[in-house]
A protein has these predicted regions:
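Walker B catalytic acidic pair
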Residues: 98
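Active-site-proximal or metal-binding-adjacent scaffold patches in catalytic folds
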Residues: 1-93, 102-134
Length: 134
């Protein structure tokens, strides 16, 4: 993680959530924008783009999820996000959370579980002002 990029992202997050009243409605453009910000600052632009991004009215017991299709050639990764979040902070934290799963699947060839690889990002998230939970 580059410190200068991380500081810039931390300032951006603080500014965005300062007057966050909610609910927050998301769309593809905003997802792409925040994906680029987080990928640059936290993952050093290593993450591949999702092959498909779906915005859903509801997900069973989740605020977002990554679907991995490792048997396909090439491997495919899809992101599913909710259309409406309680706050913009919830949206940003959910997207960043799912980006860790993408990192696990695409770069580490990991299971994508909430394991030590997943939680190794907790200090980075804390530095930029985000929480990391299951």
């Amino acid at each position: 993680m580059r410190r200068k990029r991380a500081l810039k992202l931390r300032r951006k997050i603080r500014a965005e959530i300062l007057n966050d009243r909610g609910p927050y409605l998301t769309n593809r453009r905003v997802i792409d924008l925040w994906f680029r910000y987080i990928n640059r600052a936290v993952f050093d632009n290593q993450l591949p783009n999702f092959h498909k991004i779906l915005i859903k009215k509801w997900l069973k017991r989740a605020m977002g999820q990554v679907c991995a299709y490792p048997d396909k050639n090439p491997k495919r990764f899809e992101l599913e996000m909710l259309k409406k979040y309680r706050t913009k902070r919830d949206f940003i934290e959910t997207l960043a959370h799912e980006m860790i799963h993408l990192y696990q699947f695409a770069l580490k060839k990991d299971t994508g579980n909430h394991n030590s690889t997943f939680y190794s990002f907790r200090p980075r998230f804390k530095f930029i002002g985000l929480g990391l939970s299951q």
